Amino acid sequence: MKTFLVFALIAVVATSAIAQMETSCISGLERPWQQQPLPPQQSFSQQPPFSQQQQQPLPQQPSFSQQQPPFSQQQPILSQQPPFSQQQQPVLPQQSPFSQQQQLVLPPQQQQQQLVQQQIPIVQPSVLQQLNPCKVFLQQQCSPVAMPQRLARSQMWQQSSCHVMQQQCCQQLQQIPEQSRYEAIRAIIYSIILQEQQQGFVQPQQQQPQQSGQGVSQSQQQSQQQLGQCSFQQPQQQLGQQPQQQQQQQVLQGTFLQPHQIAHLEAVTSIALRTLPTMCSVNVPLYSATTSVPFGVGTGVGAY
């Protein structure tokens, strides 16, 4: 019985020891499972250096902000644009000197002389000599072109004389080419104005200080008598006096027309252009390039 109890106690001790060993083994097996999540916790604890690494680039951002000031320094380039705007402003005043140069290069008298040179009728002397009857007709009071102050009413031609001069003028005007009629009529009126100036109807500017009142009145009376006593042979006499006409042309090249003479020239020209074509039943084409702009001062065309 004692042996049985001993064996029973041994068995109990063995079973308890085995149970303890099993529990220890089980606990040993469970502890590594519990210890395995600990390293991730340590890894999570190691994340602060990562946060520190994240914090380290953050201080590097000021370096980017420090690099931005040079970009802000590029803004002075925009501030450098005002000098460009300042350069544009001096360009505009540079245009004004060009306009001033145009005004300085062409004084008023030179501009008028250029206009006159462009509008002086270019007509052959033979054509003007051919239209000499028209010139004599226009100089007398039998035409509306003649002015009252040039001739007295008592010296007016008779209607028969005017009719004869009218026929001669129309015959010569019809023989001139149509394209040359306008310039020829304008040249005749121009020569009449200059002839009046030479004969003393209008005093030239250069001769005003030298002439006296009595000399002017005598020259006007002589010219009125010459124009009032014109005969039908006057055109033929003038046709044969070419040397005298050349001398008159040389003398009158230095004469100048005054502004009131220019207005008188335009008025007489417009009347003649309305009278002669209707009177002679001829076509006189008008050119706007010469009719719209008046004559200037300082012309040098002689009377034919």
UniProtKB/Swiss-Prot annotation:
SUPFAM superfamilies per the UniProt record, alphabetical: Bifunctional inhibitor/lipid-transfer protein/seed storage 2S albumin
Keyword Signal assigned: yes
Signal peptide (residue range): 1-23
Keyword check for Signal: yes
Compositional bias ranges of the Low complexity kind: 41-92
Function in brief: Gliadin is the major seed storage protein in wheat.
Record-stated family: Belongs to the gliadin/glutenin family.
Protein name (Swiss-Prot/TrEMBL): Gamma-gliadin B-I
Protein species of origin: Triticum aestivum (Wheat)
